[in-house]
Amino acid sequence: MASTSSGGRGEDGRPPQMQPVRSMSRKMTRAGTMMIEHPNEDERPIDSELVPSSLASIAPILRVANDIDQDNARVAYLCRFHAFEKAHRMDPTSSGRGVRQFKTYLLHKLEEEEEITEHMLAKSDPREIQLYYQTFYENNIQDGEGKKTPEEMAKLYQIATVLYDVLKTVVPQARIDDKTLRYAKEVERKKEQYEHYNILPLYALGAKTAVMELPEIKAAILAVCNVDNLPRPRFHSASANLDEVDRERGRSFNDILEWLALVFGFQRGNVANQREHLILLLANIDVRKRDLENYVEIKPSTVRKLMEKYFKNYNSWCKYLRCDSYLRFPAGCDKQQLSLLYIGLYLLIWGEASNVRFMPECLCYIFHNMANEVHGILFGNVYPVTGDTYEAGAPDEEAFLRNVITPIYQVLRKEVRRNKNGKASHSKWRNYDDLNEYFWDKRCFRLKWPMNFKADFFIHTDEISQVPNQRHDQVSHGKRKPKTNFVEARTFWNLYRSFDRMWMFLVLSLQTMIIVAWHPSGSILAIFTEDVFRNVLTIFITSAFLNLLQATLDLVLSFGAWKSLKFSQIMRYITKFLMAAMWAIMLPITYSKSVQNPTGLIKFFSSWVGSWLHRSLYDYAIALYVLPNILAAVFFLLPPLRRIMERSNMRIVTLIMWWAQPKLYIGRGMHEEMFALFKYTFFWVMLLLSKLAFSYYVEILPLVNPTKLIWDMHVVNYEWHEFFPNATHNIGVIIAIWGPIVLVYFMDTQIWYAIFSTLFGGIYGAFSHLGEIRTLGMLRSRFKVVPSAFCSKLTPLPLGHAKRKHLDETVDEKDIARFSQMWNKFIHTMRDEDLISDRERDLLLVPSSSGDVTVVQWPPFLLASKIPIALDMAKDFKGKEDVDLFKKIKSEYYMHYAVVEAYETVRDIIYGLLQDESDKRIVREICYEVDISIQQHRFLSEFRMTGMPLLSDKLEKFLKILLSDYEEDDYKSQIINVLQDIIEIITQDVMVNGHEILERAHLQSGDIESDKKEQRFEKIDLSLTQNISWREKVVRLLLLLTVKESAINIPQSLEARRRMTFFANSLFMNMPDAPRVRDMLSFSVLTPYYKEDVLYSEEELNKENEDGITILFYLQRIYPEEWSNYCERVNDLKRNLSEKDKAEQLRQWVSYRGQTLSRTVRGMMYYRVALELQCFQEYTEENATNGGYLPSESNEDDRKAFSDRARALADLKFTYVVSCQVYGNQKKSSESRDRSCYNNILQLMLKYPSLRVAYIDEREETVNGKSQKVFYSVLLKGCDKLDEEIYRIKLPGPPTEIGEGKPENQNHAIIFTRGEALQTIDMNQDNYFEECFKMRNVLQEFDEGRRGKRNPTILGLREHIFTGSVSSLAWFMSNQETSFVTIGQRVLANPLRVRFHYGHPDIFDRIFHITRGGISKASKIINLSEDIFAGYNSTLRGGYVTHHEYIQAGKGRDVGMNQISFFEAKVANGNGEQTLSRDVYRLGRRFDFYRMLSFYFTTVGFYFSSMITVLTVYVFLYGRLYLVLSGLEKNILQSASVHESNALEQALAAQSVFQLGFLMVLPMVMEIGLEKGFRTALGDFIIMQLQLASVFFTFQLGTKAHYFGRTILHGGSKYRATGRGFVVFHAKFAENYRLYSRSHFVKGLELVILLVVYQVYGTSYRSSSTYMYITFSMWFLVTSWLFAPFIFNPSGFEWQKTVDDWTDWKRWMGNRGGIGIVLDKSWESWWDIEQEHLKHTNLRGRVLEILLALRFLLYQYGIVYHLNIARRHTTFLVYGLSWAILLSVLLVLKMVSMGRRKFGTDFQVMFRILKALLFLGFLSVMTVLFVVCGLTISDLFASILAFLPTGWAILLIGQALRSVFKGLGFWDSVKELGRAYEYIMGLVIFTPIAVLSWFPFVSEFQTRLLFNQAFSRGLQISMILAGKKDKETPSTKYLGHTEESFGLEHDTNTFNHYYLWT
């Protein structure tokens, strides 16, 4: 090795630069070792997996070294040394991240191995490696050809390739022998055929996998590999500097995608990925309903159908832009080949487009030009397609990425940097939509092709001069470009702009009702009187002004996009504005002439117009004005006509539609068919009639008379300084009264929507058969038709069989056979999940073979106790006739089956055991006697029923012996003895003439000895006892005889019951027929994952919190049945699990009960298991195997053949991709959590071989001598204990930098999905095995011809929330979420037709969406709620969204108060951003009126209504504040006529329904009633109220209102991680204060002051019950907002915790802020961050903040005039003096503060003198005020109420004008004022908590309140709260223990609280 060592370690022996490494080897080795240390030696990372990203190419070498280490350690050493040399050449200075540590670690390892490794085959390294290479080739590759799988061969070829590379560095070229060279050339020639593959090993030789033998795959490959007549590309001499591989690119191509790659320069990984994608698509579509005989080629219709799907959007785009489509097919061309070329080209563009995939029309533009190039290459030559014509090809495989995608990506990156991490206004930068909509205009063709990078799209005016020292991968911000088509302006006016028709309807209806109510009669019929009707016509004037407002908003808010608009669009905006202005002038003028006896302004207009105007001119004007609305109504009634006109691109139609709506590429033709239109119109007509009637009779009419009285009153005695004392009509009073009423009027439609949606949803759910099977009793009663229903719905009938239309109770044996396979697998799965025990499993199983039993063998849980009951019935039967007894038995359906089965099974078991023919004859004769006596109706006379119980007992003993241990010595004798006893009982005790049978047997056998009887039944066949199916029969019979309890209690687990009943119930619901697996749609599942938990570690399971509670211990108490089942499973001796296996099983058991990735993956992989089982079943039926039952164990060849075919079809139909965005970083990380996530994900890949993991790989590569980061999308699979790379596709840059994280994570991985459908699953979801059977039914919903309707593009599925059983909060959230994903979405889909995509597990039409922007939108901030935008986009582009409830998936939710609040805040933020978005604007404007109403009230309108609800309380209380402080309440409202009217309170009572959360509860009650029964629903409702559900919902109302309003006003939306923990933990007071201070506490305290002031100074309505209810509801709101976080905080009222929280809060308040001080450490840091939104808001936002702050000045203004010291003076001087006092107080406080800073440390005496002087001055002033001026104690308290709000107003204004106050030097004073207020608020909130904490029972009550639901589930919270776990108990480390080994030490002195993990 000497020569190799010296020659291999550098050109000059040991290079100098390696000396530091060697000298630091010990130190660096320690660092490296630390990097790879792992507590479990078996899980220690392998060195090949620790390679730094800049050295990624050496990882395969190290993997090979590890693979051959056991075989030849010396050669493995040489491989590692070669890797080290290569690493040193790649990075000689070790500048890359982690390179130095890795090289040091590797060098240290080499030094160790050099001493211990020995030569095995030769004496020198060159000879050793050559001999090993030859041996390896001969033993593995040569012998493995045709025998090993492609996957195994791929690995062998990879090893051989690396070995030869190493060999060349060890052996000089001249010394490599011929055999080695020959083998190496053979490897080089074939290695590409054996690359690692995803699903299809396309070019692999040797043993074919089953999937490659499928005829559809062969046909698809044949079509894709048709390269006849394609010209061969060549490369220009300019590419001479390319490496050898690239120069070889032009030599050959195997398929059309390779040809496209050579022409355009697509990456090899992209080509391989899309090749498989296209083949699978073709195969899956083509095989559908096709005869497999003579199946050799793809049908032309298949390619045509695929073309139509992929290019529907492209063709629409071409028509819209009026340009010719380049999908051209010249005469004489191979149309199929050309079609596949076009499809392949689109797929390759899409596969490499990265972030540009979010821009579908940009992709259309790219494809448009490249398709033109393809056509030019193929048909543009003079001598076309002769095979020898060469065309210029792309220079390298990254040409397309570099020249097309990267420039567009850089534009995106440049724009997103203007976003400033969400702080910049949306109008300041262009998002994905803006850049994509650039291609909606014909001006996009100015980009030309190849794209001109100097075009306006790429270059900004100030980018000519580059920024100095700018890195090459950076982009300058440049000058802002205009928005495209729309500007996302941050204003509430967006709500009016988007939904103007709704607001106009509500305003005009309100005006109409007020006019009608103003009539003296008050009757609604008054509208038909002439004067009222004439007045009602004024609504058109209002309408004109509202239209003017709409036109103005359109003009102003779209101004930022004007530069991108066409002239016709700008003219439309201007014309609309001018027309609206004209009508706003004309209608009032014409109306003025029509008024009789005009006065005032109307008289002026009337005289000005002149006498030539006729009185009816106004009527003509109205007719002309409403003409467009009449046309709109016609279009509404004829949706097909509207749809045709909107989609038309004819110029005349475009001109006609120009006025109605702006021409836009999307949002055309979204109108529904007539029946759907009728349904949602009926819904809304009924709702609006109810709403308007209620508003008229309850809200408006009762207020009219008091308003008239107030209008006529004149008040002179004001109690404050009135600025307008001579004003008439008391406008202020009227506004104060009508303000809340108007707000309630605009909001209460939301209440009516909740009521009507609940009613319609309940009715529709009932008609959908929901909840027909709710309990196990119901399941048991209907189980006899379940097999028929199962086969009718979930199994395809063979060809030629008609589908049964009606289910009946006749049972077909083949139905039972089909059903039993699936049912038993379902039951076994639940056992594997520990939901049921072994015994419960046996009771639930259906026999897997029919045997010789003549009746249906039902599961034992249906037959439980039937045999004992029948025996008792027979024993006690007093009648004489057999018929009566048998009639009694048959009256119980299952009892008859049980009796017959038991009899026949006993007969078969005994008969099968006997070997002696005479013994068998006795048994036959006994059975004959039984049968003939039954037929002849003499059974009771021939048999004694009294002996039956004794026989049953003996049979039970007999069966138990048969199932006992076969190895026991007396096993046979025991069986013989009991068998003889049984025969004796039958013949002697049961049969009347039984002795005759024995005597005949004796005579027939010729034996007359009397003792022969004792020798009978001794010859038995014990081999049967080892037969599995025979033992199953014995077990089943034993269960029939022994199970006594009622089957209603089986299974015990509530979850198992729920799953069984839902599955059975779903079989009776409407669903499409199941196709054969081969005919079903193929689909993928995609799960985005970031850094969440994958699998809990052993340390996490056993880590105790401060109360000694572990996750494991906690879960044992929550799931006691499942824990018991788990212990039974792992302790089963048959499994023989090692301690290590038990530890792994324990980790999985815990992880499968949390919200972990492992749970999600397990659930999704059930799809594959179900598909394989369904395939298996179909194959067995096709081959008529075993009467429809599964093949027996003996038929192993059939089973293997069927299994291989089933797996192949499952590969074809299902793919699961988990997008682990940072998997690569986790793999290289040294942090234990990241390493754990990496290892756990790897183990998932190894456990589930078909699981695929996609991740973004970040590498350091040297480009032009400089290191830079390069990003790749990579797809992995598990292979031989490691991950194996399948595809690697280079990206133009970091994809997640452009948009929101989750959609970008999905987008990079979507290219690796397959199939026609795509299901999106979050990592906190679960799936259930039995639900997977229905997947092929669900996918049939996409079949466009199924119901004659347009096919859906998104299928919505229901969810089951599995986190509701822990605490009351979890239960509330679970119920709320469940009602939303069931009844809520049911109504949205039908009848309202406005369901979108609300998260997962929805199923997308994959091809539709990947050609239209993907399955989500990703623009920063605006698409924060990325999932719903997928639904918006789908609907706008002509999609159709449905909802289906016969299938469900599981979903977890956050269960802690703070986590729930984070979630609600995130959703409210998202809705705020939606309000600003173009999608909501376009949907709101382009839906018809009623569908628009549905859209509004189910999306942003719900949150706006929440905000109005809160605003109503404010308006009401501030209105009352105005009335009581001004004295108007006493003067006006106390008059008898006004006092009698309490309409305002009645209206507010309706509002409080929303406020208290009853709207949330209504759908919950209906859904629970439907699915569990209305008694249960009523009970749950009562329990929820007792557990303070209304407090929770009222609190969340405040969360919604705050974050929705703040988002629209100021922005600041961000993704809020909410956690996936098990349950809640105690949150400190400071944490709660930080989280809820601004959203709830400030608002709550403001309402407290309002209520106190009104209580002190107001006097009206005190006796009214409605007033009391309103007051109560407001105090309830206040209490909820102030104290809900503490009520729902575990241990929130425990004294010690309260003391600790106060200490922590004081410390936090006192800490100073500064750079680097986090917000949870210092109040100053938090206070600064709380104002972050004001730093970045615009001028409008600041002005609004100041205006809102001015309301706090009203308190001081009103209260000072009510002070006794004011002596009823109402001059303005009083108010001025109050300000002087306030400023004096603030000045004194400032002096104290400054004195403390100046004198506090060095001049203590001076500071004390200052304080003394101030104190004396204060006493003097107070004395004078009390004695001289008449100040009272009540005045002091009133002054506090007056001045506190004023100080808060000053503080808010100071924050809004921060820069101004800083400039004036007052900012420190503002900060100190803020700190003082925080202290006051904290003290006010904390005091009640501290008082309640004094009483221990409060804490106990709170615990019961929080965890009552868990108590009802058996959760022993009392044990957890009472004491810690017994430390002496054997640890829960491994689960070789039973449940009893986990005890609790009862200690009443331990802390009475508990923390659990999040």
From Swiss-Prot:
Localization in the cell: Cell membrane
Keywords on record: Cell membrane, Cell shape, Cell wall biogenesis/degradation, Glycosyltransferase, Membrane, Transferase, Transmembrane, Transmembrane helix
EC number(s) given by UniProt: 2.4.1.34
One term under GO cellular component: plasma membrane
Catalytic activity: [(1->3)-beta-D-glucosyl](n) + UDP-alpha-D-glucose = [(1->3)-beta-D-glucosyl](n+1) + UDP + H(+)
Topological type in the membrane: Multi-pass membrane protein
Region annotation (Disordered) ranges: 1-29
Highest taxon listed in the record's lineage: Eukaryota
Ranges of the Extracellular topological domain: 526-535, 591-620, 695-730, 1518-1547, 1598-1640, 1689-1742, 1793-1812, 1857-1878
Biological process according to GO: (1->3)-beta-D-glucan biosynthetic process; callose deposition in phloem sieve plate; cell wall organization; phloem transport; regulation of cell shape
Chief location bin: membrane
Function comment: Involved in callose synthesis at the forming cell plate during cytokinesis. During plant growth and development, callose is found as a transitory component of the cell plate in dividing cells, is a major component of pollen mother cell walls and pollen tubes, and is found as a structural component of plasmodesmatal canals.
Name used for this protein in its record: Callose synthase 7
Gene name for this UniProt entry: CALS7
